[in-house]
A protein has these predicted regions:
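Glycine-centered tight-turn motifs at strand-turn-strand junctions
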Residues: 650-671, 685-686
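Loop-rich non-cytosolic ectodomains and luminal regions
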Residues: 21-603
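Short, glycine-anchored, charge-dense loop/turn motifs used at functional sites
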Residues: 643-651, 677
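C-terminal tail/sorting-segment detector
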Residues: 21, 674-694
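Residue-level detector of functionally pivotal "anchor" positions at catalytic/ligand-binding pockets or at interdomain
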Residues: 600-627
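Bacterial Sec-dependent N-terminal signal peptides
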Residues: 1-28, 587, 667
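Structural beta-strand segments of beta-rich domains
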Residues: 323-325, 626-630
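A glycine-anchored, Pro-Gly-centered beta-turn/N-cap motif
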Residues: 402-406, 637, 661-663, 673-676
Length: 694
């Protein structure tokens, strides 16, 4: 992992930035710029990074600039908050038959085959082989329409996409073929993209993706420096292209980390919700952390409750050189508490030295005496998105004395709920079997990015193959949930994942340029003198693109499906069995994906009878989860408005004697579940019925 230090810049920042400006920075961002720290960042004062910036009007956007410029922006009265996130982690032959998707591709029992034709499938990832046969059509032409390499500074004949101003964009087949691959360190992106949209033209379609005729757009991240704001930009880039060519679009995010509130209110999740809508869907991976011990949740009923105490442990050897070593604590709005760090003797079973880290103003450096070498940097913030307290602990510990541990203690001073997440790369949480200490549970191991957004479709993984190259996976059972598949609920109690799909072991394309030595070969094919490889991978990273490919076939049938309607179709058509039972739940969501049933349900919704489209009279509609707003564009008399379910049941009706152009009428939707609805509006002989999703 590349490391660039910014100690030269930190002195400037601390001396020039006022206290009020520091309060605009997220806790992680404060620590990145703290005076005198050896901040482990992939950026220096002149190198650029991508941040989330929230303005005083509440609008959040992304900005690509240097840390020095961000420091200047913090002094700007129009800026409400600046946040730089941590880096993301990367998270079919049997699978297509098992889910009924082979029948979708063949058109069996359907009006026609559904292969994703006319739909854009976007992948934000790393490890792409642009020239793989899996991304070619029947006549050998690439189906990849665009590539944005965010971390590449220059490439002959290519420039940065105009709307974003960094990286390079490849817009022609010649340039994409010349580009070959974004990196030589992994095959993750190739495998993921081919599961979603790999071609059926080779090897008799045995390893084709779920949407083999879809148009493909790839965004290649630089995993050494990318932030979640870069992922947001990647999603927007893909949606912008789909808008330009007039096609529906689904974007896959087989990425995640545990930097955030896990409640759908992060800057990333809020922007993802805003970008989605009719014909604009995001599918994400739940995460591969079910067995890992890194999350604790505690609801305190009163100040008299016993404190929460847990050990912060090291999954890897302690080091002061890794930016990802963190623990985050989130406390619900208005909760009062005291938080401390201490060095604990496992031999004497007592704290040797302790320091209060909350309440604090801004940042604090904690040293644990002679028991640990290095420091823990702490920053606090009342997060403006959810009004929760966010406490960020950045470990810079290089050694710990034998038989000692680091303890985090939360003493309640009021009732309230606390969630604690370790980064699960370098740090974990544990009780060490010491009486009075709390061990993590397996609940709420769902990851940020793909697992927590309110409109994102989140996929867990189940097992469709346990053998590979004469070997057998010892911890997996056919049909069972993957032992790794992260579970919900989210911190605000929502069911995640919504659906599960095949994710273990999946055969798909792998990159010919991958020199990491980690590929598990399954098959190969020679075309035009070049050998193309296919290999095994497992994880929710494989389940998510399977779902994304299924969604692409649904969008082919109904291009204006909203995220809410997609979720409704997937959940109501999902399968249950002896493994996936007592649904919905936080492991399986609503069950196993049934691609054929989902496509059939989609076709039913597009074939609702008595829907007329021959009238020019129709107000503009604005739909949100709680309200349907009608804005009338012309004067009309004797107007009737009727809201019906997709099955035709009348749910609400309104009669208006006269309406004037520019007037509006609202219909409450909060009491109705998510799904597809019909709205019929009539005025005299003018009648029109439209479908919309809530």
């Amino acid at each position: 992992m590349r490391k660039i230090y910014i100690s030269i810049f930190t002195a400037f920042f601390a001396s020039s930035l006022g206290v009020n400006a520091q309060s605009l920075l997220s806790p992680r961002t404060q620590l990145m710029l703290k005076k005198g720290s050896i901040t482990r960042s992939a950026y220096n004062s002149t190198e650029e990074t991508t941040a989330f910036v929230t303005l005083m009007d509440g609008k959040t956007t992304t900005l690509r600039t240097s840390l020095a410029k961000l420091a200047e922006m913090a002094e700007n009265g129009q800026v409400k908050r600046i946040s730089i996130t941590g880096r993301p982690q990367q998270m079919l032959d049997v699978a297509k038959e098992e889910t009924g998707h082979a029948d979708v591709l063949s058109g069996k029992s359907l009006s026609q085959p559904f292969t994703g034709s006319g739909v854009v499938v976007g992948i934000v990832d790393s490890g792409f082989d642009y020239c793989h046969e899996a991304f070619c059509g029947k006549h050998g032409r690439l189906r990849i329409a665009r590539v944005w390499e965010q971390g590449t500074e220059s490439f002959e004949g290519c420039s940065a996409p105009q709307a974003f101003g960094y990286g390079i964009e490849m817009t022609s087949e010649e340039a994409i073929r010349r580009g070959k691959a974004d990196c030589e360190t992994n095959s993750h992106g190739t495998h993921v993209a081919a599961i979603a949209a790999g071609s059926s033209a080779f090897l008799d379609g045995k390893y084709s993706g779920c949407a083999p005729d879809a148009e493909i757009v790839l965004v290649a991240l630089d995993l050494n420096s990318s932030t979640l704001a870069d992922i947001s930009n990647g999603v927007r880039y893909i949606f912008d292209y789909a808008e330009k060519v007039g096609k529906p679009c689904v974007v896959n995010l087989s990425l995640g980390n545990h930097d955030g509130p896990h409640d759908g209110t992060s800057d990333f999740d809020r922007l993802a919700d805003e970008m989605q809508g009719p014909g604009r869907i995001i599918v994400g991976a739940a995460g591969n952390h079910r067995k890992d011990k890194f999350h604790i949740s505690r609801s305190f009923l009163s100040p008299d409750d016993a404190p929460l105490r847990t050990f912060i442990s090291f999954k890897q050897k302690p080091t002061s050189d890794d930016i990802s070593s963190f623990v985050q604590l989130w406390a619900e709005k208005d909760m009062d508490m005291e938080v401390s760090l201490s060095a604990y003797s496992l031999f004497q079973n007592r704290e040797m030295v302790s320091e209060v880290i909350y309440p604090i103003e801004g940042t604090k450096t904690v040293k644990l005496g002679s028991y640990a070498t290095g420091t823990i940097e702490v920053a606090a913030e009342k997060n403006p998105n959810n009004e929760k307290l966010s406490l960020f602990l950045d470990s810079r510990i290089s050694t710990i004395r034998n038989n000692y541990g680091i303890v985090l203690t939360v003493k309640p001073k009021s009732a309230g709920k606390v969630d604690i997440w370790a980064d699960n790369i370098y740090l974990a949480l544990e009780s060490k079997d010491v009486e009075g200490f709390t061990a993590p549970a397996s609940e709420s191991t769902i990851a940020e990015v793909g697992g927590t957004g309110k409109r994102i479709v989140t996929a867990g993984a189940y097992v469709t193959r346990t053998d590979y190259n004469s070997s057998v996976l010892p911890d997996e059972s056919l049909g069972a949930l993957g032992s790794f598949s992260s579970c919900g609920p989210t911190a605000d109690g929502r069911t995640k994942p919504e659906i599960t799909a095949p994710g273990c072991f999946i055969i798909s394309a792998v990159s010919s340029f991958d020199s990491s030595g980690t590929k598990i070969p399954a098959a190969s094919n020679e075309t035009s003198g070049r050998v193309y490889e296919y290999g095994y991978q497992m994880g929710t990273s494989m389940a998510a693109p399977f779902v994304a490919g299924v969604v692409a076939t649904m969008l082919q049938a109904a291009p204006q499906l909203s995220p809410e309607v997609v979720k409704d179709i997937l959940s109501t058509s999902a399968r249950s069995d002896s493994f996936a039972s007592s649904l919905p739940n936080s492991s399986w969501g609503y069950g196993k994906i049934d691609a054929l049933a989902a496509l059939s349900r989609t076709l039913e919704l597009t074939d609702i009878r008595n829907v007329t489209n021959d009238s020019a009279f129709m107000p503009a509609l604005t739909v949100n989860p709680d309200m349907l707003s009608l804005s009338f564009l012309a004067d009309a008399a004797n107007v009737s408005v009727a809201l019906r379910s997709a099955e035709g049941t009348c749910l609400s009706s309104i009669r208006l004697n006269n309406v004037a152009a520019g007037s509006s009428q609202c219909i409450p939707l909060s009491s109705f579940p998510s799904g597809v609805y019909l709205l019929t509006i009539s005025s005299g002989s003018n009648v029109k019925t439209v479908k919309f999703g809530k």
